Amino acid sequence: MQNTYDYDDIAREYLGMNVPAFDEIFPKTKKSETPSDEIPENILKYACYNAYVAYKAKDALTEKLKETEMLDIYNNVEIPLTYALYDMEQAGIMVAGDKLKEYGERLKTGIDALEKDIFAEAGHEFNINSPKQLGEILFGEMQLPGGKKTKTGYSTSASVLEKLEPDYPFVSKILEYRQLAKLKSTYADGLAVYIGEDNRIHGKFNQTITATGRISSTEPNLQNIPVRMPLGREIRKVFIPKEGCVFIDADYSQIELRILAHMSDDKNLIDAYNHSKDIHAATASLVFHVPLEEVTKEQRSNAKAVNFGIVYGISSFGLSNDLSISRKEAEQYIKDYFISYPGIKNYLDNSVKEAKEKGYSVTMFGRRRPIPELTSGNFMQRQFGERVAMNSPIQGSAADIMKIAMINVAKELKEKDLKSKIVLQVHDELLIEAYENEVEQVKDILKCNMEQAAHLNVPLDVDVQVGNNWDEAH
C-alpha cells in the first residue's frame, strides 16, 4: 500500500510522532570514528523504537486494514506466511562451491575469448563496458546505422543493439559479452559472498516489497536468474541438496492465464483448459482461423506471445517488437485475439473502469493495489496505470495463491513430522529439499496443496520434478 514500512514513517503517519530514523541512529561514520562501545547502545535504541512503534500503532493499523477490507488476507495469509518464510531463511540452500568456481572459470574463458574477437574486429582495444567508447566504435568508426547521439554520446542500450544484432555479428558478440559479464559478476562472483560456513546461502525473503504481493528475495536475489540462456540456466546446477536428500521442484503451469480464464469468465478459454487443450495451439487456431491440427509452430509461438502479453497489457508496439512483425500485423493479432476471447476484452475494460472509479485494483483474495497513475496529467503515466489495472489483479491473485500453497505445504510437512523443508520460492515454483525416504509423500503434499490452494473455474495444474540439483529438478 505504500513504498516503505520503516518504523519512523509509520510513527509519523499513524501516530503523529517523530522518532529517529535508522540513518540517525546509525550515522554513516568511518569505522575509526565509531567508538566500539556505542554499537550495542545504538542497536538497543533501534530495537526499542521498532518495538515501541509496532506496539503503539497496532490499533491504528488494524483499523486501516479493516477500512481497506484487507484484515482477512493479513490474518490468514500474510501472518502465517511469516513462519514459513522464517523456516526457509533458517534452512537455506546448499551451494557446491567447487561447481560455482568452475562455472566462474568457464564464464571468464568465454569473456576473454569474446574480448579478443571484439578487439580484433574493432582494430584496437577499448573499454567494452563504457557506453561512450562502445558508441564511438559502433556508430563513429564502424558507421553502423541507427546511432542516436545524446549529450553523453551514442546510445548503446540493449534495445538499440538488439535491432542491429541480426545483421551485424560484431554486435551479437557485444551482447553475448554483456550477458556473460553479468552472469559472472552477479552469480559466479556474487553468490560466493553469501555462502556461509555451513556451505549454504541463507537469503532473505520479502513479502511486502513488490506492488503485486509477490515474494521477492534479497542477499542474494535468486528471482532473476536468466533461465532463457543456456549458460544462465546452468547456474541452477550449483544449488544442490544435502547428503541423503534430493530436490523436488513443483511449478504451476500457466497460473496467470488460468486466473485470467477464471476472472474473465471467458467461455472459450475456460473450455480450452477444462478439456486439457494446448492453450497456445488453441489460441492460434482461433486467431489464425485454422483447424487445431493444422496449427504451425510459428503460429503457436506467435499465439503464445499474445497469450502471455495480454496478461501484461501488451501494446501493438510491444508485440510487434517481440515478434519482429509490423505494428499493423500486431494490431490485427490483438484484435483477432479479443474477437476469439470476448470475455477477456470485457474483463480488461471493466478492470480499468473500476480502478479509475475506486483508485485501486483488487485481487481474488482482496489484496488492494493503489494506482495513482490513473489520474496523472501525464499521458504515458495514465497508460502505465491502465496496464497496471489490467494485470495487477491477475499477478496479485497468482501471488496470493502461491502464498496460500506455501503455508499449507509447510503446515502439512510439520503435521506429518517430515524432515523435508521448503528451501526456495521463485516465481511460480517451490523447491523442496526432500529426504530420499520421504520423496513420494512430499510429491503428493506439494501437488495436492498447490492445486487446491484456490478453487477456480479451471483446474490449477502443477508439474512436479525430482533431481540432484536445482536445474535437474526444474
Model-derived regions: residue spans:
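C-terminal polymerase-core module
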Residues: 109-116, 120-172, 339-391, 433, ...
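Conserved "right-hand" nucleotidyltransferase catalytic core of DNA-directed polymerases
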Residues: 2, 6, 10, 14, ...
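Conserved catalytic alpha/beta cores of large enzymes that bind or transform nucleotide phosphates
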Residues: 236-260, 271-304
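Short Gly/Ser/Thr- and Asp/Glu-enriched loop/turn motifs at secondary-structure junctions
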Residues: 79, 129-133, 301, 423-427, ...
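Metal-dependent catalytic core segments for phosphate chemistry
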Residues: 8-11, 256-288, 368, 372-382
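Hydrophobic, well-ordered secondary-structure elements that form the walls
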Residues: 130, 213, 251, 284, ...
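Conserved catalytic core of nucleic-acid polymerases
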Residues: 90, 202-203, 207-210, 285-418, ...
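Active-site palm subdomain of RNA-directed nucleic acid polymerases
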Residues: 65-77, 81, 401, 405-426, ...
